[in-house]
């Protein structure tokens, strides 16, 4: 059973937070590698960089550059070791699916574009399971017929 995570799931793997225990245990129990796309990795890296900037401007927000850089190094190490299955989606098809999801669900539920693209990527890749800690994205994935176990 293939699974596709969003950035909230990846962040829970690489930074100790409320959902980390659940994310790590689920990831360890998976029979196959998580599928990741360049879009997901870009969003994850961007999020880390943004949190480092927030911290630099106001130490009560975000997290320190040393922590962020450690997260980026750990991700790179995991990618090099094959912890994740790097996928190369057909972005035209992902965009077609995303447009369909947007038309069907956004007006009623208010989904963000990146969330729609991640669910569309998972559908395109044939993933049966979507891993997220974002309630609105969970609603979209479930409405799209995916299992969201967390």
Q: Which ranges hold each PLM region?
A:
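Alpha-helix N-cap/helix-start motif at coil-to-helix transitions, marked by capping-box chemistry
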Residues: 17, 38-42, 69, 88-92, ...
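Short secondary-structure junctions
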Residues: 34, 83-87, 148
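Helix-adjacent hinge/juxtasegments
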Residues: 54-84
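Short, well-structured N-terminal submotif of metal-dependent ribonuclease cores
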Residues: 1-63, 147
């Amino acid at each position: 059973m293939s699974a596709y995570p969003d950035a909230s799931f990846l962040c829970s793997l690489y930074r100790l937070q409320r959902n980390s225990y659940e994310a790590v245990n689920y990831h360890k129990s998976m029979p196959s590698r998580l599928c990741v796309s360049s879009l997901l990795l870009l969003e994850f890296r961007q999020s880390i960089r943004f949190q480092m900037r927030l911290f630099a401007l106001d130490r009560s927000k975000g997290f320190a550059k040393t922590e962020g850089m450690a997260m980026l190094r750990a991700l790179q190490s995991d990618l090099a070791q094959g912890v994740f299955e790097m996928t190369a989606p057909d972005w035209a098809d992902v965009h077609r699916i995303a447009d369909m999801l947007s038309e069907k669900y956004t007006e009623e539920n208010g989904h963000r574009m990146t969330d729609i693209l991640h669910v569309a990527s998972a559908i395109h890749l044939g993933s049966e399971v979507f891993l997220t800690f974002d309630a609105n994205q969970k609603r979209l994935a479930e409405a799209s017929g995916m299992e969201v176990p967390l």
